[in-house]
């Protein structure tokens, strides 16, 4: 029995949810998000709550139950509050600069890295070592943050690179003579 799946998703005021043709559409103050629904799970919009239950008692349906409830909750949270990830850049000469729909990164390569910002994502650089990625789609925000981080992952000796705010970098000691 999924303990996460049993809890109903509450819909705050100003948010509407509709189910049509196997697609859940959630509209809120920040925008609109959709989710393709699985056949193994039944979804019910009941007033200001969305109930997620397995359609039949198979192992596969129970496996998707909690995940589908969380995906629905992510849609509701996205259209009301949005999601933000913050990246911190550490290293001499490492910088970031948001220029319109591009993020320009200087990461110690012989060239600058130009990262095009996808649709639905907003990138800000409050200072040249901090990158704030925000949007309404949790998956897309995390994906963009991971793609930016991939250009220069933090290394364990000096900690240089791009890391998430609050991420712990396991440090190693250098060679001893």
From Swiss-Prot:
Q: Which GO terms describe its biological process?
A: cytoplasmic translation
Query: Gene Ontology cellular component?
Result: cytosolic large ribosomal subunit
Q: Which UniProt keywords apply?
A: Ribonucleoprotein, Ribosomal protein, RNA-binding, rRNA-binding
Q: Which family does it belong to?
A: Belongs to the universal ribosomal protein uL6 family.
Q: What is the lineage of its organism?
A: Bacteria, Pseudomonadati, Pseudomonadota, Alphaproteobacteria, Sphingomonadales
Name the chain's protein. Answer: Large ribosomal subunit protein uL6
Taxonomic superkingdom: Bacteria
Task: Extract the GO molecular function terms from the UniProt entry.
Answer: rRNA binding; structural constituent of ribosome
Coiled-coil residues are none
Pfam families tied to this protein = Ribosomal_L6
Outline what the protein does: This protein binds to the 23S rRNA, and is important in its secondary structure. It is located near the subunit interface in the base of the L7/L12 stalk, and near the tRNA binding site of the peptidyltransferase center.
InterPro entries, per database record: Ribosomal_uL6-like, Ribosomal_uL6-like_a/b-dom_sf, Ribosomal_uL6_a/b-dom, Ribosomal_uL6_bac-type, Ribosomal_uL6_CS
What quaternary structure, including any partners, is listed in this protein's UniProt entry? Part of the 50S ribosomal subunit.
**PANTHER family assigned to the protein according to its UniProt record, in alphabetical order:** 60S/50S RIBOSOMAL PROTEIN L6/L9, LARGE RIBOSOMAL SUBUNIT PROTEIN UL6M
């Amino acid at each position: 029995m999924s303990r996460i799946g049993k809890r109903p998703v509450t819909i705050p005021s100003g948010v509407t949810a509709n189910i049509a043709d196997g697609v859940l559409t959630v509209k809120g103050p920040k925008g609109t998000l959709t989710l393709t629904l699985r056949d193994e799970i039944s979804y019910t919009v009941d007033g200001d709550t969305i109930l997620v239950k397995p359609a039949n008692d198979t192992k596969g349906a129970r496996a998707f139950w909690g995940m589908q409830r969380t995906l629905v909750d992510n849609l509701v949270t996205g259209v009301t509050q949005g999601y933000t990830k913050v990246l911190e850049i550490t290293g001499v000469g490492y910088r970031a600069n948001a220029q319109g729909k591009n993020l320009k990164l200087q990461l110690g390569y012989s060239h600058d890295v130009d990262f095009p910002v996808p649709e639905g994502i907003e990138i800000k650089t409050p200072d040249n070592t901090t990158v704030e990625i925000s949007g309404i789609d949790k998956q897309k925000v995390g994906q963009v943050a991971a793609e930016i981080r991939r250009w220069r992952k933090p290394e364990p000796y000096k900690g240089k690179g791009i890391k998430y705010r609050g991420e712990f970098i396991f440090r190693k000691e250098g060679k001893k003579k």
